[in-house]
Amino acid sequence: MLVVPAVTGFTVPSASAACPAVEVIFARGRLEPPGAGQIGNNFVSGLRSKTGKNVNLYAVNYPADNQIDVGANDMSARVQSTMAGCPNTRIVLGGYSLGAAVTDVTLAVPFPFFGFNNPLPPDAEQHIAAVALFGNGSAWAGPIGAFNPVYRDRTIELCHGVDPVCNPSDPNTWEANWSDHAAQAYINSGMVKQAVDFVAGRL
């Protein structure tokens, strides 16, 4: 007869045991190699140091060329899977350049639109703690809070110097000012740290 000794103090881990305190879902800029990009990685590294929390980084899976809808569908899917599997995890959305546009669509379009066919459910706002956008071309149309007021106070949008993507200007000056759009310019200027401080205060 096989006797199994009693084990005391053992608890079966729940699904939430493996859940991070914070899930950052970040979309890289146009033509950056797969991953979260320089700004995304720098932002998450800073957030981990600032908060001391378990911060997971999910890099939005999309080509980062012109297919904003593909990125928005993936970002939305990740938000929804995090909500379902880790309901207590605080979600942070972010993006740089084209990735900021991906985030705009995810948050501002509540219905299927062209190739975007996976809109967020209404209760997503209860899980999304903050949004950080860098070099966002939406400045030409208005900030994300103008399209979805729920996120107005949760969003930080940063535009470096005369970055022509987020600073509407004469097209003739774009080439001369393009260096202000570089990811490293945002990092070196302290704007990524500024976003870290903002987001940390909302977690």
Write out the residue ranges for each language-model feature.
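Extracellular/periplasmic catalytic domains that process cell-envelope and extracellular macromolecules
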Residues: 18-19, 85-86, 122-126, 148-151
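Active-site nucleophile loop of the alpha/beta-hydrolase fold
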Residues: 128, 132-139, 160-164
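Extracytoplasmic/secreted cell-surface and envelope-processing proteins
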Residues: 33-36, 68, 101-104, 114-115, ...
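Gly/Ala-rich beta-loop-alpha elbow adjacent to hydrolase catalytic centers
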Residues: 93-99, 103
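Secretory targeting and sorting signals
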Residues: 1-16
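Active-site catalytic motif of lipid deacylating hydrolases and related acyltransferases
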Residues: 18-90, 162-201
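Surface-exposed loop and adjacent secondary-structure segments within mature catalytic domains
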Residues: 146-172
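Short mixed-charge
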Residues: 113-130
